[in-house]
């Protein structure tokens, strides 16, 4: 599965808008994830997961920054996220099913914050983009 | 049996009461067909599905979307009794329509995203969680009679 030129344009132009709110988007995404899918908290026993916690904010920033890195290198996401891919495969070992859950929560956050931009076409492009990112992050699992 | 707390029920019914079910139905089904184009396999006789604007403007998509979402309204009136409420529809989707239940999960998530675009900040993480619980329970109820 690879992104068309149109899809890449949509992602890159929306990213420019999104990046100004990157940190809060990351935090909100994680809050949504942990509330809707409590089983995902099992990967964070060492975290304070209360809304507003410093750890949640820091981790949310990290996650969205990585999505941003993928958007900025949208022609070669594999290369951009290679280190992260290894981290997930050998250290974190997050079950692949969770990437869909996180992606969904990020889409919900974007839809809530940018309703006018989040057209059906943009929705499709983002869903596909995050699917590609998820594939890259799980491609070294076995 | 899924149990919804009083808060969850309020989160669900209050948003539902503000929704234009007809419009939202067309949007939900339309987005499903746009974002997950393989779902078009069930709608060969719907005419022009060749582009996002064709899909979203397609009168058959709008009509069918309205049907689907109206039925979802029944779920909301029977949140404590979903399996019974959807027993007949479950049989229909299995025996006559041959729909993979995975599609119910996809549509449920598309609906959640549409709620987010409509309600913005009001669609808080807590409200989303209540809706995820509902769409998941409806998907399970619709798959319950499969054999």
Curated annotation (Swiss-Prot), chain B:
Q: How does it assemble?
A: Heterotetramer of two alpha chains and two epsilon chains in early embryonic hemoglobin Gower-2; two zeta chains and two epsilon chains in early embryonic hemoglobin Gower-1.
All residue ranges annotated as the Globin domain in the record = 3-147
Gene3D superfamilies from the entry? Answer: Globins
- Cited function: The epsilon chain is a beta-type chain of early mammalian embryonic hemoglobin.
Under the heading InterPro entries, the entry gives: Globin (IPR000971), Globin-like_sf (IPR009050), Globin/Proto (IPR012292), Hemoglobin_b (IPR002337), Hemoglobin_oxygen_transport (IPR050056)
Q: Which gene encodes it?
A: HBE1
Where on the chain is Phosphoserine found, per UniProt?
14, 51
Can you cite a GO biological process for this protein? Answer: hydrogen peroxide catabolic process
Q: In which tissues is it expressed?
A: Red blood cells.
**Family per similarity comment:** Belongs to the globin family.
An example Gene Ontology molecular-function term? oxygen carrier activity
Classification via PANTHER family: HEMOGLOBIN FAMILY MEMBER (PTHR11442), HEMOGLOBIN SUBUNIT EPSILON (PTHR11442:SF7)
Keywords tagged on the record: Heme, Iron, Metal-binding, Oxygen transport, Phosphoprotein, Transport
Which terms in the GO cellular component ontology are assigned?
blood microparticle; haptoglobin-hemoglobin complex; hemoglobin complex
Query: Can the keyword Transport be found in this entry's annotation?
Result: yes
Name used for this protein in its record: Hemoglobin subunit epsilon
Q: Which residues does the annotation say bind heme b? A: 64, 93
- One family name in Pfam for this protein: Globin
């Amino acid at each position: 599965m690879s992104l068309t030129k149109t899809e890449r344009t949509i992602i890159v132009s929306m990213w420019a808008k999104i990046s100004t709110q990157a940190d809060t988007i990351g935090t909100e995404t994680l809050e949504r994830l942990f509330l809707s899918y409590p089983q995902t908290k099992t990967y964070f026993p060492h975290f304070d997961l209360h809304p507003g916690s410093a750890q949640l904010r820091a981790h949310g920033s990290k996650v969205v920054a990585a999505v941003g890195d993928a958007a900025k290198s949208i022609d070669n996401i594999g290369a951009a996220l290679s280190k992260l891919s290894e981290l997930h495969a050998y250290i974190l070992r997050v079950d692949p099913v969770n990437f869909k859950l996180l992606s969904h929560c990020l889409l919900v956050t974007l839809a809530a914050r940018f309703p006018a931009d989040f057209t059906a076409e943009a929705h499709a492009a983002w869903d596909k983009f995050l699917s590609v990112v998820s594939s890259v992050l799980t491609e070294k699992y076995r | 049996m899924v149990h919804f707390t009083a808060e969850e029920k309020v989160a669900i019914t209050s948003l539902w009461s503000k929704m234009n079910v007809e419009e939202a139905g067309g949007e939900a089904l339309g987005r499903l067909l746009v974002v997950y184009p393989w779902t078009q396999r069930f709608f060969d006789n719907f005419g022009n599905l060749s582009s996002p604007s064709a899909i979203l403007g397609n009168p058959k998509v709008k009509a069918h979307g309205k049907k689907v979402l109206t039925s979802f309204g029944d779920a909301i009136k029977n949140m404590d009794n979903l399996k019974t409420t959807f027993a007949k529809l479950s049989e229909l989707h299995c025996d006559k329509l041959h729909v993979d239940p995975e599609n119910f999960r996809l549509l449920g998530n598309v609906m959640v995203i549409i709620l987010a675009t409509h309600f913005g900040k009001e669609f808080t993480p807590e409200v989303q969680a209540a809706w995820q619980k509902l769409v998941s329970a409806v998907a399970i109820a619709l798959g319950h009679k499969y054999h």
